[in-house]
Amino acid sequence: MEKGTDRMAAAAPAPPAAASQCRSPRCTAERRGVRRELDSWRHRLMHCVGFESILEGLYGPRLRRDLSLFEDCEPEELTDWSMDEKCSFCNLHKETVSDRASVIGSSQSTPTEELSSQGQSNTDKIECQAENYLNALFRKKDLPQNCDPNIPLVAQELMKKMIRQFAIEYISKSSKIQENRNGSSFEPSLICKSIQMNQTENSLQEEQDSPLDLTVNRTQEQNTQQGDGVLDLSTKKSARLEEPKYDPLCSENSVSGRLHRHREDYVERSAEFADGLLSKALKDIQSGALDINKAGILYGIPQKTLLLHLEALPAGKPAPFKNKTRDFNDSYSFKDSKETCAVLQKVALWARAQAERTEKSKLSLLETSELKFPTASSYLHQLTLQRMVTQFKEKSENLQYETTNPTVQLKIPQLRISSVSKPQSDTAGLLDVMYHVSKTSSVLEGSALQKLKNILPKQNKIECSGPVTHSSVDSYFLHGDLSPLCLNAKNGTVDGTSENTEDSLDRKDNKQPRKKRGRYRQYDHEIMEEAIAMVMSGKMSVSKAQGIYGVPHSTLEYKVKERSGTLKTPPKKKLRLPDTGLFNMTDSGTGSCKTSSKPV
């Protein structure tokens, strides 16, 4: 039995002494990460729990009592410390005073005794002004001049001396700059004014929560008036407008010379600005829509350039970069209204003559069974006249509002045309009424124009109950319910297909601008042309032109690619059939109407 058990124990696998580590790279990386975390927590634990708490846990609460013994070891007053004669920082104050005295002595031609006394008095003045400056500075910020009691007294004294020394250096250097600029001796009034200016500058910087700036600003200008001595603290952007205040002697020469230089610089840099941007910015400034600052920021043009252009315009100088087509349109639209009325009266007389000629040709139309296109052309002439009236009205409205909003067209419900026509005025009368209405009411003008355009709306086939007589045809023509294109005198019927034929011909020959449906179509075509020209010339990118001109990005990009010939799929050209193939004149003998041939 013992031998059997020994064999079984030998056959059984021995338990592993220690788990072998996996050598895959993933497990190795995880082990390194865990080890790194443990190492980092050793350092984090001191900051999270506190070093004193860790020591207290290790050594007990007795250690903390022992550490508290060293809290009151700092002496309150310094008795054994004195200024070192060889310290460069401590002697800096004396060197500055001596340098100041030598500078004042060299600037004046007085004896040495007077120089020393005057230098000493000036030094005292500078120190007094520095004290006042620091007091005003601390009082403005509501900060105590005494330092934190936790800071050692040696460090407190050093900080106070350093701040005081910086203030003295700052005031002395600012007075040097004023002496060099004015060419005169050291004046206390100028020092006081410079101190006031420095206080205002530092208070502005402190209000912005920025550190105290003690650097010397060498390009600082004296903003005081010479007449009454009132300090001007206004911060204006344009130095050209401020120059006559503080330099009255040479102001005229300097301003004229600077303007001349600006004009020369403008002529040299004129090619950098866009064709339409400058004209548009000037137009917005003159209309009051934008300020000069806002226009300069929006269009990217310097304010000096805009000011020069605004000054050049009333002087009679032609402003460059004006769009020629826009100038032509503006001059054309600003003509006298009497001239426009005379042109419209001539057009109305011409339309009345065309209407009389159309009425005379009605009887000949009934006698001959063929369709004559002069009547259709007169009908299109009438529509053209109404379009001219609306264009004149739109131009006058655009001058007042200067907007590119699409004109609102009223939709008139389509009525079925019965065989009995409604009593209406003749075409010439309607034309004169439309001319007078276009002056008074825009709503009536829109409705009447829509009625004239849609004289025959789309409808089902209508057949007359009896043969068409001369009187019925005259009534159709006079009341404007049917167009001459819709009559077939052979069988005496009015068909819907002929009506569709007339409608398609009207749409092809006299296309009206379709209603703008979405945001992507609400843009001015002139502005779009300017944007396309700027992008194609390389002066702007598509995104910048979109932001400045306010045109759709996709439309602008498509039009630029279309004109440059870089479209991947160029648009297909529409096939136009000749005029002879527009209508197939067929007569089946059963009263069928004309059929329009559809383009392939």
UniProtKB/Swiss-Prot annotation:
Biased composition (Polar residues): 104-122, 583-600
Sequence segments annotated as region (Disordered): 1-24, 102-122, 495-519, 581-600
Any matching Pfam family: HTH_psq
Domain annotation HTH psq-type: ranges: 514-566
Portion annotated as DNA-binding: 542-562
GO molecular function annotation: DNA binding
Keywords, ordered alphabetically: Activator, DNA-binding, Nucleus, Transcription, Transcription regulation
One example of a Gene Ontology biological process annotation: regulation of transcription by RNA polymerase II
Compartments reported by the entry: Nucleus
Protein transport in keyword set: no
Single GO cellular component term: nucleus
PROSITE patterns (alphabetical): HTH_PSQ (PS50960)
Function recorded in the entry: May act as transcription activator that binds DNA elements with the sequence 5'-CCCTATCGATCGATCTCTACCT-3'.
Protein name listed in UniProt: Ligand-dependent nuclear receptor corepressor-like protein
Organism the protein comes from: Gallus gallus
